[in-house]
Swiss-Prot record:
Shikimate binds at S14, K15, S16, T61, N86, D102, Y216. The active site is at K65. Pathway: Metabolic intermediate biosynthesis; chorismate biosynthesis; chorismate from D-erythrose 4-phosphate and phosphoenolpyruvate: step 4/7. It comes from Photobacterium profundum (strain SS9). Belongs to the shikimate dehydrogenase family. The keyword DNA damage does not apply. This is Shikimate dehydrogenase (NADP(+)). One of its GO terms (molecular function) is NADP binding. It comes from the Bacteria. One of its GO terms (cellular component) is cytosol. Involved in the biosynthesis of the chorismate, which leads to the biosynthesis of aromatic amino acids. Catalyzes the reversible NADPH linked reduction of 3-dehydroshikimate (DHSA) to yield shikimate (SA). Homodimer. NADP(+) binds at E77, G126, A127, G128, G129, A130, N150, R151, T152, L153, S154, K155, M214, G238. Keywords: Amino-acid biosynthesis, Aromatic amino acid biosynthesis, NADP, Oxidoreductase.
Length: 273
């Protein structure tokens, strides 16, 4: 039976084994997917052992996405630009392909929620690894503009410069944004995990916009609660992005795209128990 794994530290909280087990059942694939705690300085050894034992592919979560980027012998274009890898696949020639499916997971979840991105103005909050991983797939949807904002403006400017060849992307200081100019706001910061807000002006929120928080929790996230209370038309958390990036990884490994909607519904139910 083909074996797959997710590496992380910590890893006990990972929903990936649950998601991929449902995907395998849905698509009648004979495969096993487990979670493995890798030592903080031991990703390479853990990956070596896994692939040497016949492993076919793995997902990578914090803090190993940059280690996985270095580990891969080949990189997809989106992984190169993301500077991080969340999916590894053993190739027939023995090489290891590194890919990043996070951004596609985000886009697929937005589309599943009937959020149109073509011709829209998108504000991306944050300029860390989570933001960098989603910019290329967002630009591929042809928004009229993607603005990156961050507390440290220079980081946002660096990302805007990196992705400028791929679409209309710019940067802005977070304290200069005070007009309701955006159709979609995506929060890529992890501030909400500790109940914090990213520091946006309330005047950005309007009734016909979508606010998306890339983190998720059993209850509404701090960012989405803030946006909803200010009258945002739709708020979405990152649970669907988690399922979407998993579906993209599954497609890379097995050549079949599983359906996300049913798995997301089941995952949401378990999260709220």
């Amino acid at each position: 039976m083909d074996k797959y794994v997710v590496f992380g530290n910590p890893i006990a909280q990972s929903k990936s084994p649950f998601i991929h087990t449902l995907f395998a059942r849905q698509t009648a694939q004979k495969m096993e997917y487990t979670a493995e705690l890798a030592p903080a300085d031991g990703f390479k050894l853990a990956a070596d052992n896994f692939f040497s034992a016949g492993g076919r592919g793995c997902n990578i979560t914090a803090p190993f996405k940059e280690d996985a980027y270095q580990y891969a012998t080949q990189l997809s274009e989106r992984a190169k630009l993301a500077g991080a890898v969340n999916t590894l696949k053993k190739l027939d020639d023995g090489g290891i392909l590194g890919d990043n499916t996070d951004g596609e997971g985000l886009v697929q979840d937005l589309l599943l929620n009937q959020v149109e991105l073509a011709g829209k103005r998108i504000l991306l909050v944050g300029a860390g690894g989570a933001a960098r991983g989603v910019i290329l797939p967002l630009l591929a949807q042809n928004p009229v503009e993607l603005v990156i904002t961050n507390r440290t403006l220079s980081k946002a400017q660096q990302l805007a410069d990196l992705f400028a060849p791929f679409g209309s992307v710019s940067s802005a200081a977070i304290d200069t944004l005070n007009q309701p100019d955006f159709d979609v706001i995506i929060n890529s910061t992890s501030a909400g995990l500790s109940g914090q807000l990213p520091g946006l002006s309330e005047s950005l929120i309007k009734h016909d916009m979508v606010c998306y928080d890339m983190v998720y929790s059993a209850q509404i996230t701090a960012f989405n609660l803030w946006a909803r209370d200010l009258g945002a038309g739709k708020v979405i958390d990152g649970l669907g992005m988690l399922v979407g990036q998993a579906a993209e990884s599954f497609m890379l490994w097995r050549g079949l795209r599983p359906g996300a909607k049913q798995v997301l519904r089941e995952l949401r139910r378990i999260l709220q128990e």
